[in-house]
Amino acid sequence: KQHLFDKKHTQFLSKDLRNPNAVLEISEEVPAPDLIVANAGVTLHGRAGSFDVDKKANLYYLLCGGVIDLIESYLPEMRERRSGRIVIISSIGALTPMPKSSIYSSAKAGIFAYGRSIHQELKKDNIDVTVSLPGYVRTAAHKRAGLDHLERQIPSWMWITAQQAVR
């Protein structure tokens, strides 16, 4: 599924980042942008050790490997022009235990660590990196992933809407 929108020099491109080839397609189709917002937010629900190998690999690549590959594909151009901004959307799950969401949590921890590392590294290239760790965002994703019990277990004051998360 792809949407390419160009209005006032802004492009939005949607690809299936579970597929490493899609990441390459993006960097071939769109020159290095001024701003990259890397956000992947899906999960699997289940006990550790019970995940289907392919589903686990696809999810981990989407949440961590695909995000890193996308950013890495643009870094040479951003470094060459000595400018850019990268926003990586991780999760509070990178810092807190998430029973029955271990793949999600570990992948979000991976991009959190990656983002903090490249933040230090890219300062000298005038490229700004921000890693966001939103808390519990109320979306249909929890229900689809079989995690609707979270709404009962986590106090309501800890939840935010998607609109609040993007502010």
Residue ranges and their predicted role:
Residues 71, 107:
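Active-site helix of classical SDR
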Residues 39-44:
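Conserved NAD(P)H cofactor-binding loop of Rossmann-fold oxidoreductase domains
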Residues 49, 98-102:
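Active-site loop immediately N-terminal to the catalytic Tyr-X3-Lys motif
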Residues 47-59:
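Substrate-binding pocket helix/loop in short-chain dehydrogenase/reductase
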Residues 91:
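Residue(s) in the substrate-gating loop at a strand-loop-helix junction
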Residues 5-19:
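Rossmann-fold cofactor-recognition segment
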Residues 120-167:
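SDR active-site lid
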